Amino acid sequence: MKKLLRVTVLAWAMLPLPLLAQSKAPDYAPLTRPITVDQVPGKDIFYSIGSPGIPGKENEGNTSNAGYAVTSEGVVVFDALGTPSLGWALLQDIRKRTDKDIRYIVASHYHADHIYGLQAFRDHSRAVIIAQDHSGDYSENKETADERAEVRLEQRREALAPWVDEHTRVIPPDITFADKITITLGGKRFSLISAGPAHSSSDIMMMVEPDGVLFAGDIVQNGRIPFMNSDDVSTTHWLQGLDEVLALNPKYIIPGHGNPSAAAKEAIAFTRDYILYVRKAMSEAVANWVDFDTAYNSTDWSKYKDYPAFESNNRGNAYRIFLELEASQFKK
């Protein structure tokens, strides 16, 4: 761990000086829906909350949450939003509040809605990007453990034009870690904790002390049907990760999607209840050798059908959990 942190500091020191102060605004497509950044009450910690739906032209790709903490020695950012334009907007908000260097950006996981904004930070700061080992090398447009980068980028170039275009590129992490690292900066302690495989293979949470603020990433999604239809998803580990959130006893929690909360139990309730509901329905089907289509069509989804991303995510989620439970049964 100490070796990694020494490398981090060295890498930060060797990167070129920020271009922001000396360059004009970059050629990122302007947003027509500006981001809104709020402050954690009484703390030098800020966050942006995305729209609850899936990325599209109507929300300009702004569907995820991100935030940052300001210290006397620099800024630590958690996630970078889903387009270079959004990343630039977040960077500009930081510059309005402080002239401190942006030292680190923590990628909660390598999914497009959280990382395309890294391009703006790479182009206009010398921040070191930190991710979990299983994010993969994520070389430009290459396949990784979490999603096929090239396919996703092409899809977003169509769905999110002009904010994602032919100039948009995927920025890999500078440094990765396996389980946990701690960064001490300007009187704050940032604990980066691996929480995967859960929503992805590379989930990270970031606890900021002594403030007691937790950036939870996508293992916590408040009021939005999470995406689970991936080989990387493990709802068993996901539920364990939510237990870890409670064990951290945060005073304030900022989820990967949805509204923040000063009550951890309330913040995780939607995600936990949804996972448990789907698992119960699918486990009964698996135990009784009921095929998936019959199980899905006979399940009462009325509790969740009106939530954002239900139509796009729910059936795939149920199928992924069905397969997970089926595989678990065969291992017995």
Functional labels for PLM-detected ranges:
Residues Q22, L31-T32, A287-K332:
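C-terminal regulatory/interaction regions
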Residues T176-E209:
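Core dinuclear metal-dependent hydrolase active-site scaffold
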Residues V213, T236-V290, T294:
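Divalent-metal (often Zn2+) His-rich catalytic cores of metallo-beta-lactamase-fold enzymes
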Residues K43-D93, I204-V208, V213-D218:
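Conserved beta-strand hairpin/beta-sheet module of binuclear metal-dependent hydrolase folds
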Residues T8-P18:
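Bacterial N-terminal signal peptides
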Residues F78-A80, R103-H111, I130-D133, A195, ...:
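Active-site neighborhood of phospho(di)ester-bond hydrolases with catalytic His/Asp-centered motifs
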Residues Y47-S64, S139-K142, D146-R148, R224-D232:
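Acidic/histidine-rich helix-loop elements
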Residues Q92-P173, T182:
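Active-site HxH/HxHxD metal-binding segment of metal-dependent hydrolases
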